[in-house]
Amino acid sequence: GALAESELPDSSFVLRKIKGAAIYSPGGNRLDFKAQDPRASVVDRRLFDRAAVCEALQEGVEMRLCSPVRRIRREGEESVLSIGGGDEIRASIVISAEGVRGRLARQAGIMPPELVLSGAQVEVPFAVEDPESVEVHLGAAPGLFAWVIPTGEETARIGLCARERGCEHLKRFLGQEVIRKRILGSATTINVGGLPLGPPPVTVAQGLLVVGDAAGQVKPTSGGGIYPGLVAAKIAGGVAAAAAMEGDGSAQRLQEYDRIWRASLGRELEIGMRANRMLNRMSAKECDELVNYLAGRPRLIKTIEEHGDIDRPSSLMIKMLFHLDWDGLKLAGLLRYALG
């Protein structure tokens, strides 16, 4: 998982361990499952980033604050980064982890992610039903789904991602009776931003590697980006270091990064994109039928509880295929479509 991949010795940024989920269909049908062991962690992103920075500084990384990079250009065998105030930084290899906008990546000719959803989230005092389970509300907005993630016994993050106007969709979702009656006070934090889905065809250029949100390395089934971003960052660091030692910053040399990260993450991201498209094509009635079908199949629920993997969902999809009955033929077709 993401915590193991981070290799951070301090885990004080972990707010909550998650073992299960309650999935709601548009019509109110509900599917519950809960594993014996934690399957995900809720983290304070600011504390997580701080822990990562502290670890990097201890390893000798030089960090410059308040130094936004305006432009990148190539001069011979070096990349030149233009910093605000007229300063410049020269490097043989640059790793861009600049987030969803990916301005430097675009300047270098790297295409943007396939799709960028509009996301919005608030943290509020909330009547949490089960602090070890998240809530997933299907059909709340076209794009992904809405979520309720407990951060404490009586606080939760409520958010969603939509094709557009995420804030408007979230406002409507917060006004729904099933959510509104459980909100116990005003929002303590509000976050808005883009969620990139679908990596571009190439994530390298001469002297440049792109990682994380800028490269669309986000799980389309959950919207999580920490795990794939960490995996890709390690690969990028290794390839960049080797290329710099060789004095070869060509796009052809750096293509090794593209090959390795796609071998590790590419299939799961492709399956996730197909699953996302499939979910968005389903009508409210079809979502109701799907959730109702799963809720009435204890063997399938047990399979989900035993084999669910938020980082690599394809393994669960394959196992579910072996436990479907005749009434699950439609679900079998959907799973086969997602698996490709």
Provide a role label for each language-model segment.
Residues 1-22:
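N-terminal FAD cofactor-binding segment of flavoenzymes
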Residues 16-17, 22-107, 114-119:
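Conserved N-terminal helical subregion
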Residues 30, 38, 154-156, 215-218:
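A short, flexible beta-alpha/helix-coil linker loop
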Residues 71, 88, 164-245, 251:
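FAD/FMN-dependent oxidoreductases across multiple families
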